[in-house]
Amino acid sequence: MLVLKLTGRIFDEEDLVAKYAAIIRRIGGKVAVVTGGGEVARRYIAMARKGGASNTFQDLLGIYASRLNALLLISLIGDDAYPKAPSTVEEFLDAWRRHRVVVAGGFQPGQSTATVAALVAEAAGASVLLNAANIDAVYDDDPRRNPNARKIPTLTYDELERILKTSVVPGGYELVDPWSISILRRNCVTTYIFDGRRPEYVEEILRGGNPGSKITC
C-alpha cells in the first residue's frame, strides 16, 4: 500500500504527470494519490482575490483545480483507477475498497491538500506517506529565502513542528501544516519528503532509499 502526495507544481509540466502515471501503473499493490492545485489554482485564486471574492470561495477554486489535476492523472493511469476524484473521506473509503488506485484532490475549504493526504493515509491504514514536494527535502530554514539553510535527512514530527513554528513565513514553505502533522503523528505514519521533479525517487524510496528527508514519530 502506498499513499502519494503530489505538489500541484507537478501538473505545470506535462512530462512529469505522465511519468508519475507510469510509475503508479508499474508498481504493485494499492495506491492512493492526493494532488495539489498548481498553477491553475494560483491563477484562479489570484483573479478571485483581486475581484474581492471571499476566502471560502478562493478555497473552492483551489479545490476544484486540484480535482481537475486528479482527473488528469486518473485519465493517464487508466482502468486501475477509480474514475472520479473523491470529495470526502467517506467517498475515498468506498472507492478504496473497490479499486487499486484512488486519486483525490482537495476535500473542503480551509483544509490543505497536505491535510487531505494525512487523512487519506489515516483512513487507508497506511504506514508510509510519500510527499513529492516543491523542494527536495526539509531544511532548518526556508532554502528559497536563506541560501545557508541546512538539509535535514531524518527528523521527528516534533522537530519538524518546531522548524515550521520558528523559521517559516506562513504560506511560503509548502510541505505540511499543523493539522497534517497532528494526523500523521497520532498514526505514526512515516513521511518521506522528496523533490517532486524527480518521479524516479518514488521507486528509490520503495527500495529503501531516502533521497530527501524522512520524518518519523
Curated annotation (Swiss-Prot):
Q: What is one GO biological process annotated to this record?
A: UDP biosynthetic process
Q: Where in the cell is it found?
A: Cytoplasm
Matching InterPro entries:
AceGlu_kinase-like_sf, Asp/Glu/Uridylate_kinase, Uridylate_kinase, Uridylate_kinase_arch/spir
Q: Where does UMP bind?
A: 37, 59, 107-113
Q: Mind telling me which GO cellular component terms the entry cites?
A: cytoplasm
Activity regulation summary:
Inhibited by UTP.
Which molecular function term from Gene Ontology is one that the record holds?
A: ATP binding
Main localisation: cytoplasm
Q: What is its EC number?
A: 2.7.4.22
Q: What's in the keyword line of the UniProt record?
A: ATP-binding, Cytoplasm, Kinase, Nucleotide-binding, Pyrimidine biosynthesis, Transferase
Pfam families according to UniProt = AA_kinase (PF00696)
Detail which positions bind ATP. 5-9, 38, 42, 134, 139, 142
What reactions does this protein catalyze? UMP + ATP = UDP + ADP
The pathway to which it is assigned is:
Pyrimidine metabolism; CTP biosynthesis via de novo pathway; UDP from UMP (UMPK route): step 1/1
Nucleotide-binding listed as a keyword: yes
Protein family per UniProt: Belongs to the UMP kinase family.
Q: Which HAMAP family does UniProt cross-reference here?
A: PyrH_A (MF_01220_A)
The task this protein performs is described as: Catalyzes the reversible phosphorylation of UMP to UDP.
Q: Which NCBIfam families match?
A: pyrH_arch (TIGR02076)
| Assembly, per entry | Homohexamer.
Listed name of the protein = Uridylate kinase
Origin species, per record, is Pyrobaculum calidifontis (strain DSM 21063 / JCM 11548 / VA1)
